[in-house]
A protein has these predicted regions:
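Glycine-rich phosphate-binding loop of actin/hexokinase-like ATP-binding domains
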Residues: 174, 182-200, 261-277, 312, ...
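Fe-S ferredoxin-like electron-transfer domains
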Residues: 1-8, 32, 72-163
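Immediate flanking context of iron-sulfur cluster ligation sites
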Residues: 35-60, 67-93
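Acidic, glycine/GT-rich loop-and beta-edge segments that sit at the periphery of enzyme/chaperone cores
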Residues: 3-8, 90, 105, 109-122, ...
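Conserved phosphate-binding catalytic cores of ATP/NTP-utilizing and phosphoryl-transfer enzymes
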Residues: 133-160, 292-327, 348-360
């Protein structure tokens, strides 16, 4: 058995500085084996250390400082840190192995990203959905989506609640909502604890394939359990009708314990695409007993790159098309798509005709950059890795990068090729009232991400037949806080879409509620909404066309065309 050592953790942030007594910051005393790295104990105690590299020691984001009992630096640390930093006790949490009792200082509050958004802005004020029969038929079952943002103490009633979960790569957001009114009873949000294995899905796929799959599953289950524990204080047993979880394909596979190897290598095939239903006991291995038993639904995915979060968002925005039994790109009909198809009605056919010109585009400007375009009868989706360019970096959140880049262009400190002018080329530009510098490499990362997004939008538009797009919806936290004019200025969005862009907030979370509500409705009061919901979302999983941009002719040419920072 390995020797146990004690580790005193000193949190170095503004809050702890305000709480200091006699010049000593409050400390947390932890115990761990002397044979393992520091990262697991920090992770177990929710002391989040940012990581882009999946604990390989490449990114240097998990740096900590030993003030007592520093271990000898590893070869990797000698390569990544300066001699002065090593003498001062700085080490990398993912590779250093404390051998004796020690004291460690870690920076608090430095893991900055786009704020978590839980709101949804329905587009009813900008588009008259009632004039489109397809959408009108769906609105009849979605009165509960007239969401109220009230959070009063009197909102606990003797009826049922739905737990909605947005299982993001970066964050986890949960809400408990009244099943009938849609009223928010409680909200829980936290950073995704899997981030210690990397900030992107490819890092987590690699970690899972290297033996960390069960730990990744446990991490997210513990996160969900913390949310449920908070919600338990607001209800009595068996008041929850069900829970619906919407996440990208990798996050959902990791949660369900599926093999994710197929998501990271060609031909990129998910283990399962359709809607999943499991019991709460099965998901948590009978460890959750304080909220009663209820079904847990996992939103279906469309491909390895476009997951349940997008399907849920499309469901919330009434964008899922009605195929009417047509053969899809996958050469299968709606009727044989897992047996969930339904007959096309005369009303559907009439609505499809009225809906031909209502072309809408949904873009989720997050880590995975998912996009979908539809004319009401046909839908095409794709995704492109935006990576950490749209995530936090020190004091600079992703939306600030867009706005600051546009500002530098206007001031002439940055040219259209993305090159910083002197004297900023070597050192970068210091942000006002901050120690953060916006450097040349930050601009290059942003250029690559925005070029990939813009090229993806162009390919979807061309594949749909180059129609006039009536509306672009920006989903997620990044889109919610985005300065749209700055996005036009750098060429992230087409300039001819001015006046047609709408930030719609967290469509994944709202869609998880709407889908969970409709799926549970039949079991609560005998309505048929559940059957229709299953049909709608499974048709999305098996009937929507998906494009792999890496294999698409012309993508590289478009990517290079949109690399420049200019309005177009």
């Amino acid at each position: 058995m390995s020797e146990k050592i004690k580790i005193a953790i000193v949190i170095d942030d503004e809050k702890s500085n305000a709480d200091k007594k006699d010049g000593v910051a409050p400390s947390l005393i932890l115990t761990q084996d002397a044979s393992v790295t520091l990262m697991p104990v920090l992770l177990k105690n929710h002391l989040m250390i940012g990581s882009f590299c999946g604990q390989r020691g490449d990114c240097g984001r998990c740096i900590v400082q030993f003030t007592e009992g520093a271990p000898l630096p590893t070869g990797l640390e000698r390569a990544r840190l300066t001699p002065k930093e090593l003498r001062q006790g700085y080490r990398l949490a993912c590779v250093t192995r404390p051998r004796m009792d020690c004291t460690i200082k870690i920076a608090g509050g430095n893991d900055v990203e786009t704020p978590i958004v839980t709101e949804l802005n329905l587009p009813s004020e900008n588009i008259d959905l009632s004039s489109h029969k397809i959408l009108q038929s769906r609105n009849q079952k979605s009165d509960a989506m007239k969401f109220s943002e009230k959070r009063g103490e009197d909102s606990i009633k003797n009826n049922c609640y739905i737990i909605a979960v947005d299982l993001g790569t970066t964050t986890v957001a949960m809400q408990m909502r009244d099943m009938v009114t849609g009223e928010i009873v409680d909200t829980y949000c936290e950073n995704n604890p899997q981030r210690c294995y990397g900030t992107d899905v490819l890092s987590r796929i690699e970690a899972s394939c290297n033996g960390a799959g069960e730990e990744l599953r446990e991490l997210i289950c513990e996160s969900l359990a913390r949310g449920l524990k908070q919600f338990a204080g607001r209800l009595r047993k068996r008041q929850i009708a069900g829970m619906c979880i919407a996440g990208n394909t990798t996050m959902e596979h990791l949660l369900l314990g599926y093999d994710v190897k197929g998501l990271g290598v060609a031909p990129f095939v998910p283990v399962e695409k359709g809607l999943q239903k499991i019991s709460l006991a099965a998901l948590f291995s009978d460890r959750i007993t304080f909220v009663g038993e209820f079904p847990v639904y996992i939103a279906p995915c469309i491909s390895a790159f476009v997951g349940g979060d997008i399907v849920a968002g499309l469901y919330a925005l009434h964008m899922l098309p009605i195929f009417g039994g047509q053969e899809t790109a996958g050469e299968r009909t709606v009727e044989d798509a897992e047996g969930t198809g339904r007959e096309r009605t005369a009303e559907d056919a009439e609505g499809a005709g009225q809906n031909e010109t209502l072309v809408r585009l949904l873009i989720d400007l997050g880590t995975n950059g998912e996009m979908a375009i539809t004319d009401g009868r046909r839908m095409i989706v794709t995704a492109t890795a935006a990576g950490p360019a749209f995530e936090g970096n020190g004091d600079l959140i992703g939306t600030d990068r867009i706005a600051f880049t546009a500002s530098l262009l206007r001031q002439g400190a940055l040219d259209e090729t993305g090159l910083l002018e002197e004297p900023y080329f070597e050192t970068g530009v210091r942000m006002a009232k901050s120690e953060c510098y916006f450097r040349q490499e930050d601009i290059r990362a942003l250029q690559m991400a925005k070029a990939a997004i813009r090229a993806g939008v162009e390919i979807l538009w061309e594949e749909m037949g180059c129609p006039e797009v009536e509306r672009i919806y920006l989903a997620g936290g990044f889109g919610y806080y985005l300065d749209v004019e700055a996005a036009f200025a750098i060429g992230l969005l087409p300039s001819d879409m001015r006046g047609k862009v709408q930030a719609v907030g967290n469509t994944s979370l709202a869609g998880a509620f709407a889908l969970g509500r409709d799926l549970c409705m039949g079991s609560v009061n005998g309505e048929a909404a559940g059957k229709t919901a299953v049909s709608d979302v499974n048709m999305a999983a098996y009937g929507i066309e998906s494009i792999n941009l890496a294999e698409r002719d012309g993508f590289e040419k478009l990517y290079l065309r949109y690399m420049n920072l200019e309005e177009n």
